[in-house]
Structures are given as C-alpha cells and as structure tokens.
C-alpha cells in the first residue's frame, strides 16, 4: 500500500542519514532510535504503530526470504514515554533551582547534570541514581530505564544533554578516582548515591534558591 511504502521510505531516509544503507545492518537499537525520532516530531501513537506494523512486515519478509540473517523488528515495541510527575514548583522556582549548581567545581557539575536530567525526564530518584553509563545515548538524546517488567526509553532535551556532556567530560573521573564504575553518577567514594544523599543535595539547592515550600524528589 502507499502508507506501507511511505513508512519504509521515511525510515530508509532516516537510517541513511545515520550511516545505515544495508538492510542487513539495521539493528533493534536503530529502529528504536527512529521511533524516538518520530515521537520527538510529535507523531501520533497511531502513526508510530502503523510504522511498526510496516517494519515488522518488511523485515519479517526479508528474514524469511533469507535476505537478512536476523529480524531486527521481531521483538521491538514502541517505547513508552513516562508521564512526568506533577510539578509542585512554579516555573520561576524550577529555573532558580536549576541555576543553583553553577558548575564551579566537579560536585556542582555533577549536581547540575542530575537536576537537569531529573527535570527533563520525570524519572524517579531511585532510577536516576541507578542509571548506568550504558543507559545514556548522547548522540540521539535518550535514557533507558529498566525494571523487572519493562524497558522505557525516555528522551531528554538540549539543556540536559549539555549538562551531561560537561559532567562526562570534566567531572565524572574526579568521583571515580581512577577506579571503574558502570554507574553514570557516583558519590565521592565512587559508589552509588543514596536517595537520601540526593534529597539532601536537592534540599540544599532549594534553600539557596529561596524556595520555602517542602519539596521532595
């Protein structure tokens, strides 16, 4: 059908722009990246579902015909974007809070990245402190959160990407002190931050920003 052809042509254009011109080299990650691209463009869920049906049909046929060695669309699902928790702060208060870590030292660079990422994605604090380096895709701009039942791919914007890039380049090694860690964020001992530790940090910046109300992460 025309819709089927149009879906595949748009996908092919996106993949080609990202250096993938051979169907045999298309991966599940590449298809998930395209789905995130469609979501960022504001495409309706029905449009993304139709693309998935087209992709599954096309790659399933290619696999059955022996034209590709594996079907990248076989187990793919549309990533669910987590709804952000209701914001209890005003826009002005959020702006002031995010401005508090000025980035004058490694701790403030790390804290800035954590606050920006938390605000951009709406994930839970336990998910934030448990993120691994491999959960972050800087080139496309999304994080992957997992639990026992599902995997969520959540996009983030320019401000969070900029803060993360600065942290990874200029501050993360300071906390690791020459050791290795899969964690994205660590404390000064190179270990996972506790939820209480993050709360204490957040409360400190809220006080500096002159925010009187009792906020919780």
What is the predicted role of each segment?
Residues 1-217:
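Conserved catalytic core of the tyrosine transesterase superfamily
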